[in-house]
């Protein structure tokens, strides 16, 4: 769990913002949302494979767009 030290004369909202940012970097909220409901292993593999395919397609489309030159 992320821990922050509140500095002298630091407003509460600034400290809270720092804490939220550290939680986001640690990935706590994403982990909680992922574990909120049980996901079967086959569903998890299927979702991960679909995400990998989507990443690859996005990467290839970026590379192809870079190569096309319209003069």
Swiss-Prot record:
Sample GO molecular function, one term: structural constituent of ribosome
The keyword Glycoprotein belongs to this UniProt entry's keyword annotation: no
GO cellular component terms, semicolon-separated: ribonucleoprotein complex; ribosome
Keywords: Ribonucleoprotein, Ribosomal protein
InterPro entries, per database record: Ribosomal_bS21, Ribosomal_bS21_CS, Ribosomal_bS21_sf
Family in the record: Belongs to the bacterial ribosomal protein bS21 family.
An annotated GO BP: translation
Protein name from the UniProt record: Small ribosomal subunit protein bS21
Pfam families: Ribosomal_S21
């Amino acid at each position: 769990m992320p821990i922050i030290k509140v500095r002298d004369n630091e407003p509460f909202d600034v400290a809270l913002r720092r804490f939220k940012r550290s939680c986001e970097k640690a990935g706590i909220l994403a982990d909680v949302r992922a574990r909120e409901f049980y996901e079967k292993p086959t569903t998890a593999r299927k979702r991960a494979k679909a995400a990998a395919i989507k990443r690859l397609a996005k990467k290839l489309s970026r590379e192809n767009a870079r190569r096309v030159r319209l003069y």
